[in-house]
A protein has these predicted regions:
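Macromolecular interaction modules
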Residues: 1-227
């Protein structure tokens, strides 16, 4: 498949929280890996790649997906065509195992890339995602300061200080499904080719503007690449 999903200008995330017997979960992930991931790319014009991730932290939070599929979208036009195909115009996919239909869908949203540091493309073995909102009462000027600090200062500090190969800031482009009170506005994604965990500890980080310091972190999750 072409560029990796998180290297694309947009990506579509589908996150499930299957709770079932091990054999049922295995049937679900096997279906994703051997049939569904490639089929979604093939049947949606402008989709260029797909990958599946499994949650490593936190394992006990039912509001975040334990199985995450991400699909790279090559352009905004392709993303808009995808929105137009929702409902009755959605592609007809190969039927899956029972858990494919019964597993709770906790995430379903499209994200737009808004700035990156590090390598242009990679095959990540692991990634971290941090969903956040700026200070609730931030003005437009403060949001601009938040964005500038986020991209120019914080992303590079995390990438270099925590051993990631790339950090990318994504903006919520469209929300289909997310637990209340809704999806955060920003999603910082940090990727590393090495799947092994890094020793614990966070290096000193720069202080940011008020909208940054008073940000609300909605979720902080880590995944390993599974397919």
């Amino acid at each position: 498949m072409g560029r990796q999903p998180l290297s694309c200008p947009f990506f579509f995330a589908v996150g499930l929280r299957p709770v079932a017997e091990e054999a049922e979960v295995r049937a679900l992930v096997d279906f994703y890996d051997t049939v569904h991931l490639a089929e979604v790319v093939r049947l949606n014009e402008g989709f260029v790649s797909a990958a599946r991730y499994e949650l490593t932290e936190p394992l006990d939070d039912d509001s975040v997906p334990s199985l995450l599929a991400v699909y790279g979208i090559g352009s905004e036009d392709a993303a808009r065509r995808f929105l137009d195909r929702q409902g009755e115009r959605r592609p007809v996919y190969t039927p899956g195992p029972p858990l494919f239909y019964s597993a709770p869908v906790v995430w379903r949203m499209v994200w737009e890339s808004a700035g990156s540091t590090g390598v242009d493309d990679l095959m990540p073995g692991k990634m971290a995602m941090i969903g956040m909102d700026p200070a609730a009462d931030a003005t437009e000027a403060e949001i601009a300061e938040f964005d500038d600090f986020y991209t120019r200062t914080h992303l590079p500090e995390i990438v270099s200080g925590l051993g990631y190969d790339r950090g990318t800031r994504f903006l919520l482009w469209h929300e289909f499904t997310h637990p209340e009170p809704g999806c955060p506005r920003y999603n910082a994604v940090y990727e590393a080719e090495d799947p092994n965990p890094r020793p614990p500890g966070v290096p000193p980080l720069s202080s940011g503007p008020r909208a940054w310091e008073e940000r609300q972190v909605r979720w902080r999750v880590k995944y390993r690449r599974a397919a």
